[in-house]
Amino acid sequence: MLKILFFAAMSLFITSLNSGSNGNCYYIGNDTEAVLVDAGISCREIERRMKRLGLLMGKIKAVFVSHEHSDHIKGLPVLVKKYQFPVYITPMTMRSGRLNFEESLLKNFIAHEPVSIGGLSITAFPKFHDASDPYSFIVSDNNICIGVFTDIGAPCIHLKKYFQQCHAAFLEANYDEEMLEKGGYPIYLKNRIRGGKGHLSNNQALELFIIHKPDFMSHLLLSNLSKNNNSPELVKELFNAHAENVKIIVASRYEETEVFRISLNKSVKEIPVYHTVAKSSLQLSLAFT
């Protein structure tokens, strides 16, 4: 059944297209434009997953790159070449990732200085991670804020400040401390993961959530779970015990999540998306029940 929805004002729509060491890509948009944060899966998979969700590639106006690790950039060259998307990336990340784009498509950003993409405002801030110049992002529109907080070795003061502003967030919960300790990784890799410039553990993420989540937060998408040192069931149970009115979603390393509608009105609950089809001159969009 085909449905058309004229979006209500004052909403953002978010989904994780993939989240994990095999590739990361996050979509945040309003009813007219959207951005991707990272493109760590192939262009073809981005297209397929967005199509399944009823999201139009034509709404994407830019890609923001958090850092140069391959699970965040490996789909970027083909995606940008095909669609000519502007790429917001720092020079150090460009060099470290050995990336090369048309000069006209290259855009820089500066920490804590908002970038306007249509009605969207994107603010980057530095984070602790073992990359050359890594950043997290806040995407906002009409006072609705979405955070993309993954690949973080430890919560910094900026993360805590921005988390308190979020109506929804993609938050890393990479590993269970006991599973990592008892697992088969070599000691150097264990220390890299938990050493302050690697990844957030479930407990670190939970502490941030409990202490700093604002009353108006409606959705938390737990992201970048380790395949070997975590369990979706474990981390969801852990967070649900403290969620109160926040909807907890575990982002998958194998498929896209639903599209979630984030509103200033916390009582607005979206939800499963009816897949749609774009036909010639008629642009169809998401339909929510």
Where are these regions (language model features)?
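Cap/insert and terminal regions of metallo-dependent hydrolase folds
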Residues: 157-253
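Active-site neighborhood of phospho(di)ester-bond hydrolases with catalytic His/Asp-centered motifs
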Residues: 37-40, 61-68, 88-91, 147-151, ...
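C-terminal regulatory/interaction regions
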Residues: 232-240, 244-289
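Active-site environment of divalent metal-dependent phosphoester hydrolases
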Residues: 22, 69-73, 94-96, 131-132, ...
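Active-site metal-binding motif and surrounding structural segment of the metallo-beta-lactamase
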Residues: 43-90
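Conserved beta-strand hairpin/beta-sheet module of binuclear metal-dependent hydrolase folds
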Residues: 2-53, 135-150, 168
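Metal-dependent catalytic neighborhoods of phosphoester/phosphodiester hydrolases
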Residues: 74-83, 96-100, 230-237
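Metallo-beta-lactamase
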Residues: 90-144
